[in-house]
Amino acid sequence: MIIRAPIRTKTKSFRGDQMDFKFPSNESLPRGTLEEYHLNNHHLLNDVFAAENGVSRDEDGNSQTLSDYTSTSNTNTNSGYSSNGYYSFANISDNTTSSPRIVINQNETARLTSSDSNKSDFFASHDFPGNDSLHYSSSNVVKNQLHSMEAIPEGNITGSISTAFQTIPTADNVSYDIAPSSASSLLPRKSTSKSAILPSTQEAKPMTKLNMEKDIKTIELNNSVVPKPKKKLNRVPTIRRVESSRFSNSRYSSSVSSKSSSSRCSLKRSKAIRCKGGLLYYFTSLGIKIKKKLRKLRLVLRRRLFSYNVQKVPSATNSKTTKSKANINNKSKKRGTNLVNKNSNSTPRQKKSQRYVSNLQRSISSKSLVPVLAPQKKTKPLTVDTKFKANHPQSEDSKVGSNTPRSPLVSYTPSLRRTNSSIRRAASILTASATMTPANNKNSFISVPDNVSHAVTRNSSMYSRSRLVRSKPSTALNAIARQPSIVVENKVIPLSMNRYSIKEEDEYVIDTSSMRELSPVNSVCSSDYDRESSESYSNYADAMETTEVDNKDRVECNNEIQNVDANNEETSNEESYNLMKHYLSTVIAQRIMLRVQIARIQNYKSNVVYMNKSAETNSTIYEDLVDSLLTEYEADGSSSQIFDGVTVRADEEEEEDEDDEDDEEEEEENDDEEDEEDEEDDEDDEEEEEKRKEGEGRNLAKEVDELAELSPMRKQSDLSITLRSPFAMLNPAYSNSIISLPTGVVKRSLTLPVGMKI
């Protein structure tokens, strides 16, 4: 039978990936096959009790004193005396916590150790004269070979009898004490519940000698009347209720009368269990211990914090006076303590707001849920020394001082306790934040493709991002029902409102255009098929039929192919290098020329040359440039002259450099002439300006003619370039490029965006 363990779903409120459900394999099952009879420990109690009292099987079915787990009256069991994997609610405590073992020695503290945790709680034991009867081991019980059920020790705190098969837990786990009539009638015994926990060493000191003598007398009476706790049960044990934690004494040493109101009462699960899991005694005792420790720690911290007003007296005789002074100063201190408490996070409400659990340490739930997102820092738990000195956890910010109380850093992880509000919150988080989570998030389990067509879903017309899209096929079973859901009482409740959890789509798209009818001859004996098969299987050879000759031939063929490819790459690289070199050199040369012309136009002294009209064309040089640009755009010009040839003459650059030098010298001479002209008359100035303008106009005309007369380069047939200009969209006449203009006409920068298609 496959038993599914309850697991968490992948909800955002629990901050973690979902645990993949796996069927139990042979590796995960425990080693060694145990029969169903040995898997529970209830048969040990029932069999021993039946052997003692001679109870028949018919009475077992109707008896309520037997274990509820293996009886026929239990509704959970399908068969008579066998278990089916379901635990009754009252018996969960027998399987969740291992019963603690106690060994009490003289003048030593008894250490209560449990196999579940590494914690150890210390209880002080009184000076027991000859308490060897309280020392238990499994060897004493094994000698009796389980012929009789031994009486539960009365003076012990929590005892357990270990057998060869399984540890028989006492009734302390289920908040009941089984008291035999002989012991209850002879002496008022101490209850083994939480109210009978022996006082600690710190509280044992202020007890008076009278209390110590009374305890010693009761223990001696116990040892004399009941010499050894090997008392047989001759009747049905009486069940006595345990006192609740509210009405227990502050010293926790009060005794409860052993006689109950009813001598025989049936075991009812509803009244026996006060908390989930049947761990009432464990949690109440743990809460009482932690409360006591926290109260003592609070007192110690108060003494250390607010002891600066109290005068320290070394002698012991003045201790009474210091106590009286401290009592007088307590009222005056209250205002200061209230101010400090307002600033510090020491009030319980502020601790609760900071998720500081003061009454319980939820160690099991915090260990089971390790946070995935935030790194967890290891901190020491809050412990108390025997000398009542607070152990502050060593932290980085220890510079604040040891006098300030520091609460331990509690790494909070949410528990698995599910309520109605938590279920609603998880559902709202899933439905609301599904549209906000990105697809590439590590923690998001919803994968949304980029090119999503807005499909009309059942709920809304927009595309819901919470829908699941098929991805890579996986062999895991959880890929089938990979949808947002919540587990409540081991039942998966889906949160998606869609009818189908997986988006219905075609996995295999068949192209109908490629389908054609095949005759039986063509389908089998087609020449295309033979050619394709020969090409696909040309490099194939069976591993058993390969020879060394075939390997040599393949190596030679591969080497030849690599050599041919390398040669082709070298030639193509050389061609591209030459083309780019030529292109860049021509562009740089044109930009140098354009910048020189722009500098001349922007110069206010030489700007008059471009704006004055010439006598031949009756227009300025600037207007001539614009006219040439417009005529070039309107005409069906040829392609650009940049790639007309691969080689570029070095004479062009030399001529441009010479032109630049001549222009600079002329400008300097003109500046000198202007300085001299300022001293002369106005008539001389006009004559000099006319001469200078004519000289500059001639030089500019010479440059334009030289650039226009450059011999065109030879064209390569294997390179075709089409250039597009932004004017082609408005008018097809402007389909040519800006770069295709003659170099002598272009007077502006070439940095305009140009789309180039090679």
Swiss-Prot record:
Keywords per UniProt: Coiled coil, Phosphoprotein
Post-translational modification Phosphoserine, affected residues: S25
Coiled coil segments of this chain: 648-711
Spans annotated as Disordered: 55-77, 314-414, 636-702
Superkingdom to which the source organism belongs: Eukaryota
Start-end of Basic and acidic residues biased regions: 690-702
Triggers of expression: Expression is controlled by SWI5.
Record protein name field: Altered inheritance of mitochondria protein 44
Organism from which the protein derives: Saccharomyces cerevisiae (strain ATCC 204508 / S288c)
